[in-house]
């Protein structure tokens, strides 16, 4: 099993997509790197902690390759906008891949270099990960009728899985 971390705006959106990918066995929303120990969501929302909202993705490489996960990641968010995804703005919403081994780093760099657009996605070695509060875990599945889910996450799911 391998682990990687994707930051592509609000972690609820990223989590909802990857939950539906065969070979992904566990997801945990949380916060990567930054300068505050064990931050809360309220801390992150200030935009001053240096953390990114991320989803920790645990996957079986024999069922889904890291390259496939990278392709999905780049399809489900805009990697050309700095510190913003839609109306979510701030460094906590930046596009980043927090890799856990040299092969992930190499594949991520290769993929970015092959893209024609100017990509702002950061490719950073994971330093530290803090799980988000429980109410952030499995958010879309537990709150699919909430307005944010209906307006942003559901259309993203429909677009990705019905193309």
Curated annotation (Swiss-Prot):
It is an enzyme of class 1 (oxidoreductase). GO terms for molecular function: L-methionine:thioredoxin-disulfide S-oxidoreductase activity; peptide-methionine (S)-S-oxide reductase activity. The keyword Oxidoreductase applies. InterPro entries: Met_Sox_Rdtase_MsrA_dom, Met_Sox_Rdtase_MsrA_sf. One of its GO terms (biological process) is protein modification process. The active site is at 10. Pfam families: PMSR. Keywords: Oxidoreductase. The keyword Transcription does not apply. It catalyses: L-methionyl-[protein] + [thioredoxin]-disulfide + H2O = L-methionyl-(S)-S-oxide-[protein] + [thioredoxin]-dithiol; [thioredoxin]-disulfide + L-methionine + H2O = L-methionine (S)-S-oxide + [thioredoxin]-dithiol. Its EC number is 1.8.4.11. Has an important function as a repair enzyme for proteins that have been inactivated by oxidation. Catalyzes the reversible oxidation-reduction of methionine sulfoxide in proteins to methionine. HAMAP family: MsrA. Belongs to the MsrA Met sulfoxide reductase family. This is Peptide methionine sulfoxide reductase MsrA. The lineage of its organism: Bacteria, Pseudomonadati, Pseudomonadota, Gammaproteobacteria, Candidatus Pseudothioglobaceae.
């Amino acid at each position: 099993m391998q682990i990687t971390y994707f930051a592509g705006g609000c972690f609820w959106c990223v989590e909802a997509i990857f939950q539906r990918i065969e070979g992904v066995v566990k997801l945990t929303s949380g916060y990567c790197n930054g300068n505050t120990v064990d931050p809360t969501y309220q801390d992150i929302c200030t935009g001053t902690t240096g953390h990114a909202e991320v989803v920790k993705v645990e996957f079986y490489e024999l069922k889904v390759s890291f390259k496939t996960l990278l392709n999905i990641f780049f399809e489900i968010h805009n990697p050309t906008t700095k510190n913003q995804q839609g109306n979510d703005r701030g460094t906590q919403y930046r596009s980043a891949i927090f890799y856990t081994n040299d092969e992930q780093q190499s594949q991520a760099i290769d993929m970015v270099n092959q893209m024609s657009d100017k990509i702002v996605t950061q490719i950073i070695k994971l330093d530290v990960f803090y799980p988000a509060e429980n109410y952030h875990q499995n958010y879309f599945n537990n709150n699919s009728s909430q307005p944010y889910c209906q307006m942003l996450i559901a259309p993203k799911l429909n677009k990705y899985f019905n193309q």
